[in-house]
Amino acid sequence: MAHPDGMARLLKFGVRNVPVVAKGDKFVFGQVIADVAELVGVKAPGQVGLTPDELVSRWLFVLEAAQRYVRQLPTGKLEERAVANRDRSIRYLGFHVFRIGEALLEVTEGEEMTVERPNVPPGDTVHTGDDIARYGEQVIVRIGQWWGQTADKACANRVPTYYGQQPLRDVLERCVWHSAQHVRQLMALLERWEIAPDRPVTDADLKGLPVPAGIWE
């Protein structure tokens, strides 16, 4: 968090996770733009976005790119922090890209999207980039199977999340851009070490996804 008093304000509300928008003594989670608009007193913007089918296709593309990049990560760097001000290893970051996908699959099976669900750390058997990529392959296959079998192609069903009941389509979109943002970070790490990412993901590839402007936001 960039604001020096930001965490203190969150703790005052009993909140430990971002994004959060606060106004006076009220706050809402920032995942739902309509809730934010209501809090600040403006009209919510109309949102169309990608269709669920486009989101799944974009997600698989992003996850396959992540497989390439984690294989390029130097093993000796995996326990280093991705950024100095956050206690998260590069190994964790690479695993997290795919764990987001597994979390969404669990939600489609009736589980709640809690804060903790996509943040499960890698197990003791995940040590190398190849280990992460193999885990990623399992997730990619399962996402493809789920999408091929689901009858709810509009993703209209509402699912429980830590920020309330939400349409599955919106939770899917959040998971897709969340993975995509971390893939951008993996590319940035490779470039930091002067390793050219294998077939870089471009801004054009991510068009239509609400990824943050900054790579480390």
Q: Which functions belong to the PLM regions below?
A:
Residues 1-6, 16:
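Thiol-based oxidoreductase modules, predominantly thioredoxin-like and allied folds used
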Residues 11-22, 31:
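Structural micro-motif
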Residues 22-48:
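Non-catalytic, surface beta->alpha helical segment in thiol-disulfide oxidoreductase systems
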Residues 42-55, 124, 131:
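Short, charged, low-complexity loops and linkers
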Residues 50-74, 95-106:
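Alpha-helical bundle segments that constitute or directly flank the non-heme di-iron/ferroxidase center
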Residues 59-70, 124-159, 166-185:
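Acidic/histidine-rich alpha-helical segments that form the ligand environment
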Residues 77-122, 160-217:
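Short, contiguous alpha-helical
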